[in-house]
Regions:
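Phosphate-group recognition and catalysis centered on beta-loop-alpha active-site segments
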Residues: 27-308
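Short linear sequence elements within intrinsically disordered, low-complexity coil regions
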Residues: 11-14, 97
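Intrinsically disordered, low-complexity regions enriched in Ser/Pro/Gly/Gln/His and often acidic
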Residues: 10-11, 190
Length: 308
């Protein structure tokens, strides 16, 4: 019996084989296209992620003055049991005399003065539940720190006392996210200071202000991962998530990252540290044992409750 033919030229079995082969090739092509799309998506997402968490690439660690690489007394070398309160002139004097760098907190008062205090309220240290941003300098300095005769110092008073002896880390404590008035006012005041200083903040917009308007000033991004804390300090919000995972670094492009060392198992922090190798500061280190362990992992350590 003769073979059935298609168009009087090809056996039907041959046609079916060719159609099957063409189908296989088409499926392979579709599969390759799909894999290529997946690869492009992966590379795009990875590239975007790295773009977000990358620190500054213009100022490498080696270009930061060597004088900055030392331990920093957190809010000065304070000891409340000895009557030396945090962020007080005696605490700053003790730190400077011993050669420690100083980390301190800067607020803007209602009448435009710069004071040195950590909390937004006076409640913890002065026993009055009043907001610094809603008080004048005269009102703030009418109170005393704890049971001492010390008042909350102005930034001018601290600068006069330290007088360039040790480097300073100024943490900018903004009341409202993105309010750059504090960054600008601090910069104007610090232009006349002859000592070494740098700034840091949890607010990436304030750090970005220095990137855009004062790129010569060393700037740092403060962060920690509240999700890795086991106590009431946990915070859950979009801004805390972005901050914890360093996803705002694209705004600030920090010269150094100051990260809460208790939470530094965070994936973004570890990726950033491994790939970009930026200058790193650990906060807050509270024991000599931790200090020794962290020496090989961080460039600067901000410490309290002991002396390294």
């Amino acid at each position: 019996m003769p073979h059935l033919r298609y168009n009087n030229s090809m056996p039907l079995s041959g046609l079916l084989w060719r159609e099957k082969a063409a189908g296989i090739k088409a499926e392979r092509a579709i599969g390759m296209d799909f894999l290529l799309i997946l690869l492009m998506l992966f590379l795009g997402i990875t590239g975007g992620y790295l773009f977000l968490i990358a620190p500054s690439i213009r100022r490498k660690k080696k270009s930061i003055p060597p004088d900055f690489f030392r331990p920093y007394a957190h809010r000065g070398l304070h000891d409340e049991k000895c009557g030396v309160m945090e962020n007080s002139l005696p605490a700053f004097r003790r730190a400077a005399e011993k050669g420690y760098g100083i980390e301190l907190d800067v607020h803007l008062t209602m009448d435009g003065h710069l004071i040195v205090h950590h909390d937004h309220s006076l409640l913890r240290l002065c026993g009055r539940d009043r907001q610094i941003s809603r008080m004048t300098l005269a009102q703030i300095q009418s109170y005393r720190l704890g049971n001492t005769d010390e008042k909350i110092p102005t930034l001018d008073e601290v600068l006069s006392l330290v007088d360039g002896r040790v480097p300073l880390i100024l943490e900018l404590k903004s009341t409202r996210f993105g309010d750059t008035a504090l960054a600008e006012t601090t910069f104007r005041r610090m232009q006349a200071y002859r000592g070494q200083w740098c700034v840091e903040s949890f607010d990436p917009v304030l750090v970005r202000w220095y990137k855009r308007h004062a790129p010569g000033i060393i700037r740092g991004q403060l962060a920690y991962d509240p999700g890795k804390l086991k106590d009431e300090r946990k915070k859950k919000s979009l801004i805390h998530f972005l901050s914890a995972h360093l996803l705002c670094n694209f705004l600030s492009r920090p010269d150094f990252v100051a990260y809460g060392h208790e939470t530094d198992k965070n994936l973004s922090f570890r990726v950033m540290r491994s790939l970009f190798r930026p200058c790193l500061a650990a906060w807050t280190v509270r024991s000599l044992e931790d200090f020794k362990i962290l020496q090989s992992q961080y460039d600067w350590q901000i410490f309290e409750a002991f002396e390294p």
